[in-house]
Amino acid sequence: MMSVTVEILENLERKVVLSLPWSEINAETDKKLKQTQRRAKIDGFRPGKAPLKMIAQMYGASAQNDVINELVQRRFYDVAVAQELKVAGYPRFEGVEEQDDKESFKVAAIFEVFPEVVIGDLSAQEVEKVTASVGDAEVDQTVEILRKQRTRFNHVDREARNGDRVIIDFEGKIDGEPFAGGASKNYAFVLGAGQMLPEFEAGVVGMKAGESKDVTVNFPEEYHGKDVAGKTAVFTITLNNVSEPTLPEVDADFAKALGIADGDVAKMREEVKKNVSREVERRVNEQTKESVMNALIKAVELKVPVALVNEEAARLANEMKQNFVNQGMTDAANLDLPLDMFKEQAERRVSLGLILAKLVDENKLEPTEEQIKAVVANFAESYEDPQEVIDWYYADTSRLQAPTSLAVESNVVDFVLGKAKVNKKALSFDEVMGAQA
């Protein structure tokens, strides 16, 4: 193979000019046309018997284009291997104006290469190791939440209070005119739950079933309904029903409802503590991992290939559309989401992917089989039949990609915590459970 010069363009972009001998192009084109001749069905000729000259007239140009495309791909691959180029994404091929060699056809390949990743001094980085504990108070708090989730509402003949579920008819008018979405019959909501605007809810408090009243409501400027944002409406409200909440007792029936077959309340509390502890551990680990990843981003100055960022942004856009579809928004599949809204997140993900790959390779942080099994077992623990979940993962090794990635990240976190300046941060139960994770 002739030597090829790799031209350095901007940032990670490179360019090579590929020379394709016309003799090779013509020979491959002839071969392709003969293959076409054997299967061509042309009026006036038996299948496969049309003259080659006619086949060349009909299909010659497209056959030559196909051959050139195939040879360009093959030649670029050969050059990348010979020059030890770490190509990121797919190359872009362009014609070369100066076709000064009659013996060959020239094509320029423009592409990006992976950056050289150099991990900085991790001992200079600060990371937060987040901790939290789960005791009796946290179990009590969780049990109370579980009770509220099983609230029953019973009809009462009294004035409506916060916490009651009310059923109302209402009609709203702005400047004396009804507006879209401003009226409903037998609408149910819980007072104080924030389902309605504060002035609306305050107007219902103190009413009794059968009563009607007018309530003035000022829509905030930032209200999601643009047609009414910043405007004042008068709602005529009729209260049809008031029901007060009744929480279940923490007894054997309650324990059975939570899956404790014999209704043992102590066992139920232990199960609650185990589940809550697992979730708290997951969340504090996520926050610690986020701190570690931020430290790695700071420790490495890195230019990332635009091609990889664009690919990741497109993947994130498709993921968002699929999530919308899964939520019942069937038309979301056709949404044209601008990739720019995903670029920052995509660039961070690509950067971390490159950094982690380097860190894992340099420091032998690949997970062991036992570590992967532990991650799978942790996944399975929250299901009714853990072994069934474990068997599902191991029935198809491609399903182990997610557990393997988590095991890798865990090893990276432990490695960085052993190198960086670690600041321990204890969070309360509410702080942990209120965090997005």
From Swiss-Prot:
GO terms for biological process: 'de novo' cotranslational protein folding; cell division; chaperone-mediated protein folding; protein transport; protein unfolding. GO terms for cellular component: cytoplasm. Disulfide bonds: none annotated. It catalyses: [protein]-peptidylproline (omega=180) = [protein]-peptidylproline (omega=0). Keywords: Cell cycle, Cell division, Chaperone, Cytoplasm, Isomerase, Rotamase. It is an enzyme of class 5 (isomerase). It holds the Pfam family Trigger_N. InterPro entries: PPIase_dom_sf, PPIase_FKBP_dom, Trig_fac, Trigger_fac_C, Trigger_fac_C_sf, Trigger_fac_ribosome-bd_bac, Trigger_fac_ribosome-bd_sf, Trigger_fact/SurA_dom_sf. Residues 163-248 form the PPIase FKBP-type domain. It comes from the Bacteria. Its EC number is 5.2.1.8. It is found in: Cytoplasm. Transmembrane segments: none annotated. GO terms for molecular function: peptidyl-prolyl cis-trans isomerase activity; protein folding chaperone; ribosome binding. Belongs to the FKBP-type PPIase family. Tig subfamily. Consists of 3 domains; the N-terminus binds the ribosome, the middle domain has PPIase activity, while the C-terminus has intrinsic chaperone activity on its own. Involved in protein export. Acts as a chaperone by maintaining the newly synthesized protein in an open conformation. Functions as a peptidyl-prolyl cis-trans isomerase. This is Trigger factor. The gene is tig.
